[in-house]
């Protein structure tokens, strides 16, 4: 007897034959990724092994609960997979306990809030305009609505975190939770000092390492594992895995609270196909090659920042310690929106980004955020990033001179040449 799936999709059961519209859009996206330079700091190229796991039959399996304690039968194989993911993650970051079920970094943060806070509690996080994340207490986020959010900023001259000011705010407002983390801060964070401040006011310290996780795992960025009460992260970005979230801690009591907060507090059934992909990505990150890769990510970012500076562009904090490079366009009299649109037409994708104390709207901005993780995965070296810096400058100068159309066309041809020399998939 023919199965229902075969009746619906045909005997070949392929996406192309059943839904060519979706298939063509996926193919076009693949071609876009192949032919453009991806410099968005939160993006990377997952391996075929990661994507194979995520596209597996595990998408069919429902598995509410945790390994050995499921609410459904038939979970022996997914139990093994989730246990592997947890074991590998703990080894990767040197922690005792981990939850791999959060669907995203935002939900991982929400799980921590649900574990440690009650509505109305005070939290202290980095201002969105100075590089923080929405979930760190920004007004539009639930974290800014449920809790009394106090925001720390950066030094107005150096754009570096002012730890003395953070301590002053903590002593004044007595937060229950301090968040150390960012979505657009290129420099190292002093997690030891953050913990000292937290201890002075009896606060928990959450280290949101979503952007830096892969670099931390490889020893290329300071680890907060020794200092933070709890760590959260995404699993893509510099970890180069599937899109998802994780929570880690060395405190068993906190771990139990987090387990309950994730399930049944915030989520129902976990995405077992994504957890399998996470497990594969963690194994990749444990390999020696990942350390070499992460070292190159930071080296390439430093080169990109230095070369952009040579072209006369202002770099926030004067450089980078991570994969992130932030450009301040205010001296160029250009907006982030205008530049990213022009860069995209030239085959370079990045994102417009607010700079510290920006007066432009978030939909316009006065800056750019670049990241080197994806193109380093592709195989680009320092010399390639020197060339890319030149291409970025060409596009910016084209906007300034009013000759953007011809410049974009010329740069796009150069971008496609670079991409053809470094194929993906």
UniProtKB/Swiss-Prot annotation:
Positions of the record's site feature: Plays an important role in substrate specificity: 236
Cytoplasm among keywords: yes
- The yes or no answer to whether the keyword Cytoplasm is present is yes
Question: What cofactors are annotated for this protein?
Answer: pyridoxal 5'-phosphate
Q: Which Pfam families match?
A: SHMT
Q: Which GO terms describe its biological process?
A: glycine biosynthetic process from serine; tetrahydrofolate interconversion
Enzyme Commission code(s) on record: 2.1.2.1
The UniProt entry's GO CC annotations, sorted and at most eight, read:
cytosol
Q: What class of enzyme is it?
A: transferase
The compartments listed are: Cytoplasm
InterPro entries for this protein? PyrdxlP-dep_Trfase, PyrdxlP-dep_Trfase_major, PyrdxlP-dep_Trfase_small, Ser_HO-MeTrfase, Ser_HO-MeTrfase-like, Ser_HO-MeTrfase_PLP_BS, SHMT-like_dom
Pathway linked to the protein: One-carbon metabolism; tetrahydrofolate interconversion; Amino-acid biosynthesis; glycine biosynthesis; glycine from L-serine: step 1/1
GO MF annotation list: glycine hydroxymethyltransferase activity; pyridoxal phosphate binding
Q: Which UniProt keywords apply?
A: Amino-acid biosynthesis, Cytoplasm, One-carbon metabolism, Pyridoxal phosphate, Transferase
- Residue(s) carrying N6-(pyridoxal phosphate)lysine: 237
Main location per the UniProt record:
cytoplasm
Q: Which family does it belong to?
A: Belongs to the SHMT family.
Q: What does this protein do?
A: Catalyzes the reversible interconversion of serine and glycine with tetrahydrofolate (THF) serving as the one-carbon carrier. This reaction serves as the major source of one-carbon groups required for the biosynthesis of purines, thymidylate, methionine, and other important biomolecules. Also exhibits THF-independent aldolase activity toward beta-hydroxyamino acids, producing glycine and aldehydes, via a retro-aldol mechanism.
Name of protein: Serine hydroxymethyltransferase
Q: Which organism is it from?
A: Wolbachia pipientis wMel
What broad taxonomic lineage does this protein's source fall under? Bacteria, Pseudomonadati, Pseudomonadota, Alphaproteobacteria, Rickettsiales
What gene, per UniProt, encodes this protein? glyA
